Amino acid sequence: MGKYRLLALDLDGTLLNDRSEISNTNAKWVRHAVEAGVTVCVSTGRGFPSALPFAEQLRLDTPMITVNGGEIWTKPHSLHRRTLLDSQKVMKLHALAEQHDVWFWGYTTNDIYNKERWVGDTITSHWLKFGYYTENLPILNEILKEIQTWDGLEITNSSPYNIEINSQGVSKASALEEVCRMLGYDMSEVVAVGDSLNDIAAIRASGLGVAMGNAQDEVKAAAKVVTGSHQEHGVAQVIQNYVLRT
């Protein structure tokens, strides 16, 4: 094994292609990394139930980071830490979504709600993340400017057309740092790969930060390396060219 001991992989736009599938090429090289002793960690904005099938497909029994770091798992189904988003803030975020008439969603610890199906009692629910989606960028920017004036929020995105909100301090980077503490690794031994703003902190904090070829420009600017796109098996390229190169 080379100098990198942990490979943190975003899912959408990174490990997954446009059909939300792991290509055979990516799967093969992830298995090569695992067999070489590298810890492969799924690191995603998705909730655990949505991320789990991909970890299972790759036969990973390693730590997982879900809802942008809101949950850290020592291995699938074994929760290490969970950081909640204040329900009063979710009420305000929800009201702003209604005001602008945009699509929105929220993750609680046991369900996902959205514009078509919202929770009956926001206050008593245990929230992890809230998000907005619209292709009307002026409206999206208006929402962003508003919530940037509020305290206690960590604001990122997972596409140019959404905004994702966690509790302040929650990020894939802080979660990766905790995973490293759990495993006895140093952040310099981490390769973090992603395509969106919710990946930037981890990309900057890791020994090797990698942006996908399809990544947003800010992500490419933050990364040390740009690999192929999610349609070109960019993750496999990272494993071949950096993770398993001794």
Regions found by a protein language model. Name each.
Residues G2-L6, S23, N166, A173-T246:
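Mg2+-dependent phosphoryl-transfer enzymes with acidic/Ser/Thr/Gly-rich catalytic loops
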Residues L96, H100-A205, N214:
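Conserved acidic, metal-coordinating active-site core of Asp-based
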Residues D10:
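Active-site residues of response regulator receiver
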Residues L58-L60, V67-N68, W150-D151, A205-S206, ...:
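Short, structured coil segments at secondary-structure junctions
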Residues A33, T44, N68, F130, ...:
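Residue-level signal for inorganic ion chemistry
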Residues T39, W103, E154, L208-G209, ...:
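Residue-level detector of anion-binding/catalytic polar loops
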Residues E21-W118:
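Active-site phosphate-binding/coordination module
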